[in-house]
From Swiss-Prot:
It is an enzyme of class 4 (lyase). The basic functional RuBisCO is composed of a large chain homodimer in a 'head-to-tail' conformation. In form I RuBisCO this homodimer is arranged in a barrel-like tetramer with the small subunits forming a tetrameric 'cap' on each end of the 'barrel'. The gene is rbcL. GO terms for biological process: photorespiration; reductive pentose-phosphate cycle. It catalyses: 2 (2R)-3-phosphoglycerate + 2 H(+) = D-ribulose 1,5-bisphosphate + CO2 + H2O; D-ribulose 1,5-bisphosphate + O2 = 2-phosphoglycolate + (2R)-3-phosphoglycerate + 2 H(+). The modification N-acetylproline is found at residue 3. Residues 1-2 form a propeptide. This is Ribulose bisphosphate carboxylase large chain. The keyword Ribonucleoprotein does not apply. RuBisCO catalyzes two reactions: the carboxylation of D-ribulose 1,5-bisphosphate, the primary event in carbon dioxide fixation, as well as the oxidative fragmentation of the pentose substrate in the photorespiration process. Both reactions occur simultaneously and in competition at the same active site. It comes from Vicia faba (Broad bean).
Length: 26
């Protein structure tokens, strides 16, 4: 896996977690 893909996946994961928390706790 290239560093670019890894970073994109990490950012996407963090955004997904933030989105999940917002949806779950609101």
């Amino acid at each position: 896996m290239s560093p670019q893909t890894e970073t994109k996946a990490k950012v996407g994961f963090q955004a997904g977690v933030k989105d999940y928390k917002l949806t779950y706790y609101t």
